Amino acid sequence: GRTTTAELDSLDVILFKRSNMNFVRTSHYPPTERFLEYCDRYGIYVESETAVCFVDTYRQKNYAPGKTQDSAEFTPRYLSQCREMVKSFRSHPSILFWSIGNESVYGTNFQQCWDWVKATDKTRPVIFSYPGSVGEKKPVYDILSMHYQDVNGNLNQWNRSTHGFQGEGIPALFDEWAHPACYTYATLQEDPNIREFWGHSIERMWSGLFDAPGGLGGAIWGYVDETFMLPEPKVGTAFWKEFARTAKPEDYQGKCVGYGEWGIVDVWRREKPEFWATKKAYSPVRLMTTEVASFLSGQRLLLPLYNRFDHTDLDEIKIRYTYKGVEKELPAPSIAPHQKGLLVIPAEAWQEGELLSICFY
């Protein structure tokens, strides 16, 4: 097995904040107690996920044969993971809801996990993926979990759908989306601008979801690169090639294994270009225009502003603007969370083609 250090737990949560992320899904490994303590301290919302995934899906060939989700023999294994998670972490205020399975087909063992969680913790919702596999059976989720919708928020997955980031009569969470380009090495070499385009797509998706009724949020897959070193070549490392959507499967042999370099930071926690694209897209303060077409020299500028904080009025932050090399500070207007208003820039000798730089901090 492998684990993190206290230093990495702290650094990871701090990097979440620096990138303007406020939500993390602990897929698919149990987090450390330290990590959740930092989430409590810094105000990160957490979806805590049991270590059960890929049951009866296309990855089944890599696991024991049979449909374990309906097998009484496997019930203790399902419940042990679920019970351990809830009993260990239920006192953390950062945890908003429990996930009882990832990208799996419904069965009675997932039903028993739902029943146990609902009897044990009546304060939190439960989520399950794939929800469409439940069909008309007894529900095992309060929130619709959808993975990898298009940029407009549309997806049909196992007969459950979203349109414009909205579920059908149920809140929708896209708790796996916006996978960075990492598998198509040849294409990335030909056109590195694909990574720049990824930044435009995440900004478009987040802006669309933020205003969608019932659209709760999204979780980028993933935060950190999934690559790690083994002390020596081990029997079975070829298993990783089963998941490698790459033109060079030989890269998955030997000491270096993992699913791929899919993070917005690398394994040393160095920020990649995707980190800065995320920071920009998830900015909690959004100027609704980047160009002022109509203005009068010597008059104030009125700029539309969107407060995308969940709990913070904009008058709690500071504003600094620079025009013609002169930097000035400005008190922020009072705009309630999730509301729009106006930013008033005092009169200047405005001229066409000049740059006005505004910093919110």
Region roles according to the model:
Residues G1, T50, K328-P331:
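Short hydrophobic alpha-helix segments
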